Amino acid sequence: MRGFWLRQNDNQKLMKVRDTMDAVKDAPTIDFAKMDGLVPGIVQDAKTGEMLMLGFLNETSYRKTIETGFVTFWSRTRQKLWMKGETSGNRLRVLSASTDCDQDTLLFLVDVEGDGLVCHEGTVSCFTRPVPFGSAQGKAVL
């Protein structure tokens, strides 16, 4: 296996890292066709288990995520690649990733760099607004 050694700055452990070509080649095939070239990417904090956010990836952002080790989305609003936290410093370093059974959704377990505020509204998670669900009679209220 080709590769190189990378010394991580945060804990000075040596880890084996494959080169970019091998990493992209070995990555699972994701079904980008179902949603017009995009797949949802769920981001979960590896330390706390908290769901932090959901974004969308296209083939280019998926490759970029694999190449850099940081979650990179496709911004549907700005129509461009978007490495989450590149400006704020709260980058999402991928510790592991998996796909669902249909291979059309990704789950990233991440270590959040910076102050840990992932949401653009200044919160740790984008999931902060409760949805009233249920009533005294046990029926869903939507």
Walk through the language-model features, giving the residues of each.
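C-terminal binding/interaction regions
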Residues: 19-38, 46-47, 51-52, 57-142
